[in-house]
Swiss-Prot record:
Membrane-traversing stretches: 21-41, 44-64, 91-111, 112-132, 139-159, 160-180, 211-231, 235-255, 263-283
Pfam family, one: UbiA
PANTHER family in UniProt: 4-HYDROXYBENZOATE POLYPRENYLTRANSFERASE, MITOCHONDRIAL, PRENYLTRANSFERASES
Organism: Coxiella burnetii (strain RSA 331 / Henzerling II)
Protein name (Swiss-Prot/TrEMBL): 4-hydroxybenzoate octaprenyltransferase
EC number: 2.5.1.39
Length: 287
């Protein structure tokens, strides 16, 4: 028998509820899309469904990731004490928890229209495949960007019944952003990853990592600027982008020596990038 009271702290760690920054990194693109699709006035129902769905799917994604990496995590100092790698949670427990979370997510999406449900199926497949890609390609961060941003076409489908061109422009910007912060994150484990055969953009970029991150950051802001021009957003949106630019410059300062604690700080700082872009979107629809 599973002792839920005893195991609950381990389950929460498995779902990364002890590290909520990941929830927000998934949530910000969702909120960008929900607010833009609804022209600043989303329905309460859609907002709640997408917020709850982001939290649930992030937790489910963490379980899949740890299941895929459970044998590799034992050899990486930062991850060797994760619940599945350390044995504090069994594979059976993890799969049961994943099934419960998937059922919750499926129930939520059934409250939306058919197109959104169809897109959700694709989103689930994207999330399931991602953890296994790091064994075969140096671009798992690109797939992560697609998976993390798939809520954008879903939000437009749920709100307006189709996915317009502007949704794909927002999607493009959102896909590039996780490549930025997950490359910063991968810089932490680069030496260990090389030893165990894990691939990442941090390894692919090598000594050009800061340059490539900078180019990606610039591309994110440029695409958002184009989006703002196309939608005729006011100065509040561009002020939000200006703050985001300042934060990205600070991230470049943090990773200048490529020290793991500083790379992790840069990764976490992206939460504020997402927040200020959302704040700009929120305020541009209030004025």
């Amino acid at each position: 028998m599973i002792n839920l009271r005893q195991q609950m702290p381990h389950y929460l760690r498995l779902m990364r509820f002890d590290k909520p920054v990941g929830i927000f990194l998934l949530l910000w693109p969702t909120l960008w899309a929900v607010w833009i699709a609804a022209k600043g006035a989303p329905s309460f129902k859609i907002a709640v469904i997408f917020i709850a769905g982001s939290v649930v799917m992030r937790a489910a994604g963490c379980i899949v990731n740890d299941f895929a990496d459970r044998h590799l995590d034992k050899h990486v100092q930062r991850t060797q004490m994760r619940p599945l790698a350390s044995g504090s949670v069994s594979v059976t427990e993890a799969m049961l928890l994943f099934a419960v979370l998937s059922l919750i997510a499926f129930t939520l999406v059934l409250l939306l229209n058919r197109l959104t449900v169809e897109l959700a199926v694709i989103g689930i497949l994207l999330a399931l495949v991602y953890p296994f890609l790091k064994r075969f390609t140096h671009l798992p961060q690109l797939w992560l960007g697609v998976a993390f941003s798939w809520s954008i076409p879903m939000a437009f489908a749920a709100t307006v019944g189709h996915v317009p061109a502007v949704a794909w422009l927002l999607f493009f910007a959102a896909v590039l952003w996780p490549i930025v912060y997950d490359t910063q994150y991968a810089m932490i484990d680069r030496e260990d990853d090389v030893k165990v055969g894990i691939k990442s953009t941090a390894i692919l970029f090598g000594r050009y990592d800061r340059l490539m991150i900078g180019l990606l950051q610039g591309s994110v802001l440029l695409t958002f600027g184009l989006l703002g021009w196309y939608l005729r957003f006011n100065y509040w949106f561009y002020l939000g982008l200006l703050v985001a630019l300042g934060l990205m410059c600070y991230q470049q300062f943090l990773i200048r020596h490529r020290k793991p604690p500083d790379c992790f700080a840069a990764f976490r700082n992206n939460n504020w990038v997402g927040f200020f872009i959302f704040l700009g979107i929120l305020l541009t629809h209030r004025n």
